């Protein structure tokens, strides 16, 4: 394990103030948190940070757009939805790195809120609602859940819960974010079976390219190590373009690429607040979305520890965690107002990039945020992303969701896996987080579930109330909510030492509470 570099000035690599004596998981820190590389280099490094998470930034709006039927009913708005994600990501990242926890961590759309969003969309689709109504309901649910997150963060509640959120809880929650999305339509869409020669192989090409560049060619050139997802998407997309132009793919094929939409896209797209209409507030949808927000808070809790470890500094204090969660709540609030249909949270992909490149500079991430903000308003870019065929998006999902599941399970390195207690809790949480949502999906929808609840003996009249049954349905359909609740309950009631649960391992590397100064404290000093 290498020592953190502490030599160098503004343009040289150094460790951040208060850095730990050792770098937790990285072999080096090329640029510390407080370092400012030259502007030209910072722009390239900042854009690189965003390229590492562009797959997720693109995957989420495309998943939402597909579920809402936007590709068929409003293909022109798909590009605007993608652009909105980039704008929100840029603003949220600037806010977090400047006045939040001040870690070099990118903020953007979160998979933890995708599952409840898809459940909400499914419930509304059964009622015949259009995509704008769906987005308005998603906006309301996100805004309401975000307000609660802001309160939890800035009142210090998240820091106070630190001793209750061990890796035993965090691991299954993050893992289920990826595992619970294995059957999204872009992967399991039955139309693939009807055109297997034109679609399954394109999906396989996408996955195979990502595997090739990330696992086999990563040692041959840095570009393969840094951008395997992006290169894999580009390779598969170029193949689809060639087949579309040559006529092998017809406009009716799911592999067809329509470049005409890119040429007709406005140069500057109108990404504005409340662009889909006024938010609608439904309690059941809020409850389901808050389960996703809660999962994102737990995920960010683990991400803060990871980014500190890879940046060569001490683990976050309760104070830093509180300010980070509070700012993520404000980011979610902004995302709800802008109408992404999703929220904003810390990106594990960005943290992994720090470990690979050793670039942990806050300044670099801020430069990249400005680049992403500008790109979000550039219409042709968003529309170009929207041309990705469904099989390519499905291949991207397989790679991304699998990576997220693995990141979650990696938190178990801190716990005693020889303990039958820990193995039981993690196993039960993971299984329930997959089984219960599968059961909910087989009930026939929220309406059929309500009828079933109403027929329950004795308490049926209570469970059959629409707001109650809808809340149970949405929460029960969200894997990370189910698994997280079970893990939290068992981990804090079944006997186990703090060392056994992995809490001591985190406490041993935590920074002092006085080491972090909030934005307002810095302004007053």
Residue map of PLM features:
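Haloarchaeal acidic low-complexity proteome signature biased toward cell-envelope/secretome components but also
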Residues: 1-41, 497-525
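Flexible hinge motifs at transmembrane-helix junctions and intramembrane kinks/re-entrant loops
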Residues: 2-8, 72, 194-199, 209-298, ...
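Membrane-embedded helical hairpins/re-entrant loop segments and their flanking transmembrane helices
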Residues: 34, 39-41, 65-102, 288-362
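Early transmembrane hairpin of solute transport permeases
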Residues: 41-208, 377-381, 387, 391, ...
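Hydrophobic alpha-helical bundle architecture
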Residues: 68, 97-101, 333-337, 347-438, ...
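Transmembrane helix-bundle signature of multi-pass membrane transporters/permeases
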Residues: 83-86, 90, 108, 142-146, ...
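Lipid-exposed faces of alpha-helical membrane segments in multi-pass integral membrane proteins
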Residues: 88-91, 95, 144, 148-151, ...
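C-terminal ends of transmembrane helices
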Residues: 91-103, 148-162, 211-221, 304-312, ...
């Amino acid at each position: 394990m290498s020592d953190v570099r502490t030599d160098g000035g503004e343009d040289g690599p150094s460790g951040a103030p208060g850095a730990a004596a050792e770098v937790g998981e990285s072999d080096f820190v090329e640029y510390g948190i407080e370092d400012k590389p030259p502007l030209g280099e910072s722009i390239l490094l900042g854009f690189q940070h965003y390229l590492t998470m562009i797959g997720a930034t693109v995957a989420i709006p495309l998943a939402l757009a597909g579920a809402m039927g936007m590709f068929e009913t409003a293909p022109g708005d798909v590009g605007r939805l993608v652009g909105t994600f980039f704008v929100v990501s840029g603003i949220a990242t600037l806010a977090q790195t400047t006045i939040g926890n001040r870690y070099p961590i990118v903020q953007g759309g979160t998979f933890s809120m995708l599952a409840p969003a898809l459940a909400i969309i499914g419930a509304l689709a059964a009622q015949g609602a259009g995509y704008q109504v769906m987005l308005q309901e998603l906006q309301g649910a996100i805004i309401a859940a975000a307000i609660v997150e802001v309160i939890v963060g800035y009142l210090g509640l998240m820091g106070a819960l630190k001793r209750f959120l061990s890796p035993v809880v965090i691991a299954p929650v993050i893992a289920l974010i990826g595992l619970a999305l294995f059957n999204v339509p872009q992967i399991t869409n039955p139309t693939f079976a009807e055109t297997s020669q034109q679609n399954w192989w394109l999906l396989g090409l996408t996955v195979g390219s990502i595997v090739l560049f990330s696992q086999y060619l990563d040692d041959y050139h840095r570009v393969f190590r840094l951008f395997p997802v992006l290169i894999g998407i580009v390779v598969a997309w170029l193949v689809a373009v060639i087949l579309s132009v040559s006529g092998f793919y017809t406009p009716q094929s799911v592999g067809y690429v329509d470049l005409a939409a890119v040429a007709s896209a406005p140069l500057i797209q109108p990404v504005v607040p409340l662009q889909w209409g006024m938010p609608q507030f439904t309690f059941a949808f809020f409850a389901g979305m808050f389960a996703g927000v809660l999962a994102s808070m737990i995920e960010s809790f683990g991400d803060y520890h990871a980014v500190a470890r890879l940046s060569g500094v001490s683990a976050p204090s309760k104070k830093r965690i509180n300010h980070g969660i509070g700012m993520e709540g404000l980011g979610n609030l902004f995302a709800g107002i802008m109408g992404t249909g999703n929220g904003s949270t810390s990106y594990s992909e960005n943290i992994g990039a720090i470990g690979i490149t050793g670039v942990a500079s806050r300044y670099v991430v801020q430069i990249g945020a400005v680049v992403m903000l500008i790109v979000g308003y550039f219409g042709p870019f968003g529309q170009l992303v929207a041309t990705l065929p469904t099989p390519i998006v499905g291949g991207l999902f397989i790679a991304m969701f699998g990576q997220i599941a693995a990141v979650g399970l990696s938190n178990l390195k801190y716990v005693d896996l020889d303990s039958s207690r820990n193995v039981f809790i993690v196993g039960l949480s993971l299984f329930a987080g997959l089984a219960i949502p599968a059961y909910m999906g087989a009930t026939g929808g929220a309406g059929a579930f309500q009828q079933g609840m109403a027929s329950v003996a004795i308490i049926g009249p209570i469970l059959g109330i629409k707001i109650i049954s809808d809340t149970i349905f949405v929460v029960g359909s969200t894997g990370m909510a189910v698994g997280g609740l079970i893990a939290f309950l068992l981990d804090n009631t079944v006997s186990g030492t703090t060392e056994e649960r992995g809490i001591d391992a985190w406490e041993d590397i935590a920074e002092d509470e006085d080491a972090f100064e909030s934005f307002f404290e810095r302004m007053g000093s």
